[in-house]
Amino acid sequence: MKERYGTVYKGSQRLIDEESGEVIEVDKLYRKQTSGNFVKAYIVQLISMLDMIGGKKLKIVNYILDNVHLSNNTMIATTREIAKATGTSLQTVITTLKILEEGNIIKRKTGVLMLNPELLMRGDDQKQKYLLLEFGNFEQEANEKQENALYLIIILSRTSIT
């Protein structure tokens, strides 16, 4: 028998019905486990996140989970937009995002946040590796741009003084 859609024929086997004693010939078919396109939600991390957060903060987390783009695990929104959409205060949003950052659940740049792909993602193993690299570099890029901007300001201020 030919392999089809990950199913492999492994021969036949005789089974005996315990009640009737009838011998039944059956084909043994197995399906290969593939790591194709999937959405992974890691329950342990989700539960630990929910333990850290409660009430209105949970509303913010749900908003993030509902609005994150699963193609790249990012969400474009300011803290004010999140506060307005969730009906929570700006301070609650800021506090919640800080808790999520400290728990390595999200990383932020101005107006953009990225959800840790170990928590939730859609794709295969290759995409998970790619998103994990992106998550690791996400904050670093923003810090480098900020440092470069400060360096330029210092240089410009020195040249305008002389």
Swiss-Prot record:
GO terms of biological process kind: DNA replication; plasmid maintenance; regulation of DNA-templated transcription
GO molecular function annotations of the record: DNA binding
InterPro entries: HTH_CRP, Plasmid_replication_RepL, WH-like_DNA-bd_sf, WH_DNA-bd_sf
SUPFAM superfamilies from the UniProt entry: Winged helix' DNA-binding domain
Alphabetical keyword list: DNA replication, Plasmid
Cross-referenced Pfam families: RepL
SMART domains for this protein: HTH_CRP
Keyword Endoplasmic reticulum in annotation: no
Protein name: Replication and maintenance protein
Lineage: Bacteria, Bacillati, Bacillota, Bacilli, Bacillales
